[in-house]
Amino acid sequence: MTIEFFARLPLHGETQYIPGDNRNRGDWNRQPHASTGAVSSSEVGDDFAYVDYLSQVARAAEINGFSGALLVNAPFGDEPWIVSAALARETKRLRFVDAFHPGHFSPWQATQMAASFQRISGGRLVWNVIQGGSDGLLRANGEPLPHDERYVRAIEFLDLVKGFWANESFHYKGRYYEANGGGLRGPLARAPIPTICSAGTSDG
């Protein structure tokens, strides 16, 4: 058995300085002069911004032999797929484990986005499919399904993704999703489907 080590990229701020310090390139500085992410704060005095900091962390993980990096789906953080797509161009071998809720994307949208990412990155996307979290926060963000139903939906979601990936004309009818002839074609269909993983603490 091979053991792999994965780093974690901070999508909700990270800094050696106290919150609010002008030198905070780890971002999530809540002060009015805070960085926008791509552009450094004018009060810092240089052009090193939050996305540059994340690039350094990703490159350091790659140089030090990590197999990949986890990008968590923090409720108020940056979106993992967007950030990892930017960082894929800054690295050569590092895999990106992007956490997401199936309810945030349609199966077709997720399939097309993942295939595009795989083409751009050379097949370095890993999906961390999550269904859990705070019920209150999930409802606040538009998630209508209760705990058990989210797991059933996730199974259907992945059935559709695999079907779209393997067929140019895929048909499916489930409880939450239906497809009538969709599927990847051309170069997108030749991209490798992401490794899919999931973790949780549910006891039901």
Locate each region found by the language model.
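Acidic, glycine-rich active-site loops and adjacent beta-strand->loop/helix elements
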Residues: 74-76, 100-108, 131-135
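A cross-family glycoside hydrolase active-site/sugar-binding cleft signature
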Residues: 6-8, 72, 97-99, 128-130, ...
